[in-house]
């Protein structure tokens, strides 16, 4: 039996009859379906998956990976259990199950091309799977990625994880409509300073920038030096027009704190002032009821008591200051000075969530 076959001769296509079983026909057929590709020298390929011609060009998987890499990939595919395969992110769910089922029915994979016979495995995903097997995410790498994601949700602006981990002390600052409070803690969770001050005149009059500058500068002069200054990121919604004066006050205060405390930013571009998610602190201390954060007064009261009663309290108040701090707390019990409580809780949460 013969079939027509096309050959390019003298720049024109011509038809020649060839036997179906002819080795020449097979060679020509393979030549038409596959172009030459040069295999990289023992490197993991970085394929542009947006290029739809990758498969059409005939680049077989076996030519994209060295023999050693192929052996490593096949060893995992042929020996790993369903649970072990799910350790690779791209193989979770149905894909790992399908690999195991395919092995049971057809035996071990003989080459990488055979992986595409498994349901859900197309050309692009197969290359990604092979790369992930060669470069699995280690436990340490996963932990770093998780910590980086947490930091992005917890604090703004984004800063290097290494800078956060190396912090020695912070000043946690919480401002309200009438007062501002701060807590200075080191990485041993020792409370080095904790106080509040009032600034009643700021929300009176025309919200003059010069008045804010004078008032906030005076307050900052009382604050201790630290590696980071952590502000509470919160404020009323834009959707309520009646709260616009309060919102304006919060933003002006925040802007002043960012400008006056970021003393080296112009030189090195490094942020020293950060804003921390208020609700994240509330969740950490179980103060949230739905979307509403409740008072942290009782938590602070318990921390003060534990510092005296326990050998290893959660927070350490220096003996020479504990009496003053307890008196300060007692004097605010009737007024519920939330800024004072929140500044301490925010500092503790920063260390426990971002540093430790």
From Swiss-Prot:
Lineage: Eukaryota, Metazoa, Chordata, Craniata, Vertebrata
Keyword match Manganese: no
Entry GO terms, CC: mitochondrial matrix; mitochondrial nucleoid; ribonucleoprotein complex
Gene this chain is encoded by: TEFM
Compartment list: Mitochondrion matrix; Mitochondrion matrix, Mitochondrion nucleoid
Keywords: Mitochondrion, Mitochondrion nucleoid, Transcription, Transcription regulation, Transit peptide
Entry's family note: Belongs to the TEFM family.
GO terms of biological process kind: mitochondrial transcription; positive regulation of mitochondrial transcription; transcription elongation by mitochondrial RNA polymerase
Extent of the transit peptide: 1-35
Cited function: Transcription elongation factor which increases mitochondrial RNA polymerase processivity. Regulates transcription of the mitochondrial genome, including genes important for the oxidative phosphorylation machinery.
Protein name: Transcription elongation factor, mitochondrial
Keyword Protease: no
Molecular function as annotated in GO: DNA polymerase processivity factor activity; nucleic acid binding; transcription elongation factor activity
Subunit organization: Interacts with POLRMT.
Principal location class: mitochondrion
Gene3D superfamilies reported for this sequence: AF1531-like domain, Ribonuclease H-like superfamily/Ribonuclease H
